[in-house]
């Protein structure tokens, strides 16, 4: 029997281990959504309005959100009326298809435009969402793809954020541009852009402050960052990435709306999916915002930031083996 090529075997093992980590990470969300659905949809009873109402309630409890839930129930009701779905158990698979369909149009990989040098990624988000950690993981990922990377410590109000970035930088041999605690964030990022240009760096990832206690001041600061960046490169930032903590539920959508007013958001990274029962918020985000989901994080490991795959995510959530 012919052996599988080693590279393919290793790649499928990698995919498998990530899928298993994601399944483990989503265990609380699975309990909230998939296991609740199983209890409703077992048995051979026919689909009726009462059953569809129970499915609707379960979706709302699982943080799927009103818009996404209404869309799913409308589609399932139409399929039932046409006779495509008859028995309760058939809803289980149909529901997974609906969930994948919600996510698919809202997913787009991050593509680094090599004509922009450096390609500038401005990372925003409130304190505590895992912004600085995400930057470190993303830098490592891009480095692994053969890109030269530089980091800008633009969160100058949190000394720990600068230290954390410097540790990531040292660990992965990535240069970090930083100034003293409390210095001007826009100035740090401008200096980093100049330095990256001089050193012919491919990608510059800039951290920013996330203090929501003084929302007006934070938004003014971010506006200034964008304005000053554009003095160095009128097309910057080339990616405005917001980092969201899955555990914040509906609040995550409010954060997208807030930051999008001052930074042109082009990508979302959703973190901490392993620590919450609110993984359903991913569908809510996809249905209610126009910003594509780039990455998800389901753990602390440097490899636990991955490009988002709707099929894989839904399969892990429902513990099926469809992980393409």
Task: List where the protein language model places each region.
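Non-catalytic terminal/linker segments enriched in charged/polar, low-complexity residues
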Residues: 1-108, 116-119, 144, 321-324
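P-loop/Walker A NTP-binding module and the surrounding RecA-like catalytic core of P-loop NTPases
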Residues: 100-324
């Amino acid at each position: 029997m012919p052996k599988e090529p080693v590279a393919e075997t290793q790649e499928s093992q990698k995919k498998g281990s990530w899928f298993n980590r994601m399944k483990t990470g989503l265990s609380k969300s699975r309990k909230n959504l998939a296991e609740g659905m199983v209890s409703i949809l077992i048995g051979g009873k026919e689909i009726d309005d009462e059953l569809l109402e129970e499915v609707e309630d379960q979706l709302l409890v699982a943080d799927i959100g009103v818009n996404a839930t209404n869309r799913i129930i409308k589609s399932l009701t139409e399929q039932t009326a046409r006779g495509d779905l008859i028995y309760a158990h058939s809803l289980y698979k149909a529901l997974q298809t609906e969930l994948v369909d919600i996510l698919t149009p809202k997913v787009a990989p991050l593509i680094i435009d090599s004509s922009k040098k450096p390609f500038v990624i401005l990372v925003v988000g409130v304190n505590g969402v895992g912004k600085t950690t995400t930057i470190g993981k993303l830098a490592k990922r891009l480095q692994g793809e053969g890109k030269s990377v530089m980091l800008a410590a633009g969160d100058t109000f949190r000394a720990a954020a600068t230290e954390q970035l410097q540790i990531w930088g040292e660990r992965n041999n990535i240069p970090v541009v930083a100034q003293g605690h409390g210095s001007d964030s826009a100035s740090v990022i401008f200096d980093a852009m100049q330095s990256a240009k001089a050193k012919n760096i491919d990608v510059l990832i800039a951290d920013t402050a996330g203090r929501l206690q003084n929302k007006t001041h934070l938004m003014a600061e971010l506006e200034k960052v964008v304005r000053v960046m554009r003095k160095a490169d009128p097309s910057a930032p080339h990616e405005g990435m917001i980092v969201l903590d899955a555990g914040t539920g509906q609040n995550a959508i409010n954060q997208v709306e807030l930051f999008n007013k001052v930074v042109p958001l082009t990508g979302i990274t959703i973190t901490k999916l392993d620590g919450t029962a609110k993984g359903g918020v991913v569908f809510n985000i996809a249905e209610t915002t126009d910003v594509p989901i780039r990455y998800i994080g389901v753990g602390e490991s440097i490899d636990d930031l991955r490009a988002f795959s709707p099929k894989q995510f839904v399969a892990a959530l429902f513990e099926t083996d469809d992980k393409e």
